[in-house]
């Protein structure tokens, strides 16, 4: 048991380190984009153009299939060996690539109608902006086709307990998009010391071409991993193959779940935001980006590392070990996310100022990010709760939970956006996802008693929040002879250190995950 949990800890640390690198590169990319385009109609168009391509990836090869695929691949690897596992992988990958190609072609043909339709992507945009969305979306579909394969490669490598290259792939994607931002988009070259970088002057189109380049690098970096684990491609598609049917059985409900999540994260927010102030869609994108930094470092890293192991535990019918694994993960996530969400909200304005938005834009992003942070713990807990069901190859319960979440979010987003604008959409997101996480954990605890037994974790976390918040408030109120951004980072770091003594038991648990 201890060796298994240590393996999960190592994997989580690897994933967290490379997610941190990816987020650093992503932050740099978004910083440069903000300085180039601001909260502009062009950038709103680019963000809106990602919607349908992202949905195809999420439904077919990304969130829908990858999470459902790993438990089945782990079972095949455990019981039938690696060659049989890769045979199944090839059959599913061939099917997914074909389905993605067909859907991408259909969307490219009808892109103009999908953008301008009242229930479409951006009905609130004017005709020139809608035309720009159409062009950019067609370019992004090329990247989607590449991601249809690379998303499955991640599942194949993680089923083999290999996490390094899938984690590094995120950063390679950011390298490609950075090239788009720094070289392809600008009208004049960036100056780095004595070197002037070339500039292709593509404007917002440069970001789309950078996305395609990033998708190429995302796939290429993982090829050595396939070779290491003796991957052999099988040029076959067989829907009657028992493994393919097993994957599709789990994938069907998972597609519904991811579709509801897409509605909540992208379609409904952007549809509503396109009718609000210019820049609202981009404010949502930046607010979400800020919340996603700690969420992916904590929730995604732990959840991704945990899934192959808890899938093995279910295969071996180790219910007690499964329950303990999840309980430890939940306690660690609460101990880290609750204090961090509060402290990050307190230092938000100096952090957002570095993007260079005007006063109105800065306020939009600050309060949108703060609203998203209310759901940081909920989003992170959901990373664990959902994977606990997929480890059992149960995709029905998360489907119904996400459907309920979508309805709840829709009502709250419409109401809150009328009261407080784009911030209300982010607040609705936080409350809806937190409610979904609580529901799934409640149902899990009924099946696995003791799973949500938190002991003294919450009282100690509450004390940590109070102590750290007071300390950060004191530091921010001082007139330090430093730039506001540096003062905010120092306050955040000191506040984080103040949290450590209160959550030390959970930090020790993290090393045993």
Task: Please name every model-derived segment.
Residues 1-513:
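Membrane-embedded alpha-helical bundles of multi-pass transporters/translocases
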